[in-house]
């Protein structure tokens, strides 16, 4: 027996797509085809059927969890005889490069903010918490971008802690995929949302992953519900190569792009470079740092070919 499957059987309820879709119950589809087009990621053939079968049941589940936390807050208010400030419900979304985390995050944000109980849903990506490009170069970490050490974890934890504490306004740094760098003069203002979705590669990490300093808080300490978007590495590598080819024709063609020199590559050259980037950076980061955190998630979305979800694992 595969030990990974054995662990998952012990920790999770497993649902094939058909059975998971039945858990939607009567939740209405409030997303139009036009809206879906704006939310869809590069190379993803996401359909309204996928939203109906996978994301509507998930939004129903999350709505129930958020409601449970809100009720708990009322209990605390009554016990303390004062208004407690529980802060927003925080959902983290982890997974490999090219797996479709951003699309999952955007769809959930759109669906969750249409529930009347929690209309204000903000989405923050951890890309903005990468060290600035100059710092990465100075530290010799440019080829380790995306690895845990390339993030300003102190800054990220301070941000998520302030959000959880209910601070009125917190500024999150933004990231430019054109300049491949943090935006130094642009920020995203977070003002006491009902729900915060935090999307990034390493948001499931704990002190177990950094034994040198196990006492400091981690992002996962502040998260109420965690999601891991999963797929076989062979699929992930192929999706990454496809995305690289799309970027070559699109974002890389911008003269201001950090990767503008890739825009003149032939298809064969682009495929070779993308495969090498995967084999030397993204693949090792997946196997060493990202995939080992998978079984910490409250829910695992497993993708098959064409980015279609075929299995959902819900922690018992």
UniProtKB/Swiss-Prot annotation:
It catalyses: (R)-pantothenate + ATP = (R)-4'-phosphopantothenate + ADP + H(+). GO terms for molecular function: ATP binding; pantothenate kinase activity. Pfam families: PRK (PF00485). Transmembrane segments: none annotated. The keyword Transferase applies. InterPro entries: P-loop_NTPase (IPR027417), PanK (IPR004566), PRK/URK (IPR006083). Pathway: Cofactor biosynthesis; coenzyme A biosynthesis; CoA from (R)-pantothenate: step 1/5. It is found in: Cytoplasm. Keywords: ATP-binding, Coenzyme A biosynthesis, Cytoplasm, Kinase, Nucleotide-binding, Transferase. ATP binds at residues 95-102. NCBIfam families: panK_bact (TIGR00554). This is Pantothenate kinase. It comes from Shewanella frigidimarina (strain NCIMB 400). The lineage of its organism: Bacteria, Pseudomonadati, Pseudomonadota, Gammaproteobacteria, Alteromonadales.
């Amino acid at each position: 027996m595969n030990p990974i499957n054995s662990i998952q059987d012990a920790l999770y309820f497993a649902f094939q797509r058909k059975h998971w879709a039945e858990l939607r119950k009567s939740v209405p589809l409030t997303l139009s085809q036009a809206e879906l087009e704006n939310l869809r990621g590069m190379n993803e053939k996401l359909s309204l059927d996928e939203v109906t079968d996978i994301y509507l049941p998930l939004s129903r589940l999350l709505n129930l969890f958020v409601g449970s936390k809100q009720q708990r807050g009322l209990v605390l208010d009554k016990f303390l005889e004062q208004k407690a400030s529980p802060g927003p419900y925080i959902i983290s979304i982890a997974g490999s490069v090219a797996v479709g985390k951003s699309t999952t995050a955007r769809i959930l944000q759109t669906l969750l903010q249409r529930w009347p109980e929690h209309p204000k849903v903000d989405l923050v990506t951890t890309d903005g918490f990468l060290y600035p490009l100059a710092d990465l170069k100075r530290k010799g970490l440019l080829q380790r971008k995306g690895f845990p050490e390339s993030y300003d974890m102190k800054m990220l934890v301070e941000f998520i802690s302030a959000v959880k504490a209910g601070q009125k306004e917190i500024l999150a740094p933004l990231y430019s995929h054109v300049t491949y760098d943090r935006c130094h003069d642009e920020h995203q203002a977070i003002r006491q949302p009902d729900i915060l979705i935090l999307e990034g590669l390493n948001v499931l990490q704990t002190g177990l992953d950094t034994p040198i300093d196990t006492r400091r808080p981690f992002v996962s300490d502040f998260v109420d519900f965690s999601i891991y978007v999963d797929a076989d590495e062979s699929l992930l590598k192929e999706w990454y190569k496809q995305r690289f080819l799309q970027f070559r024709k699109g974002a890389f063609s911008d003269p201001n792009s950090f990767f503008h020199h890739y825009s003149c590559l032939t298809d064969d050259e682009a495929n070779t470079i993308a495969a090498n980037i995967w084999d030397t950076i993204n693949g090792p980061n997946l196997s060493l740092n990202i995939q080992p955190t998978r079984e910490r998630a409250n829910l695992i979305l497993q993708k098959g070919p064409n980015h279609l979800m075929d299995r959902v694992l819900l922690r018992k």
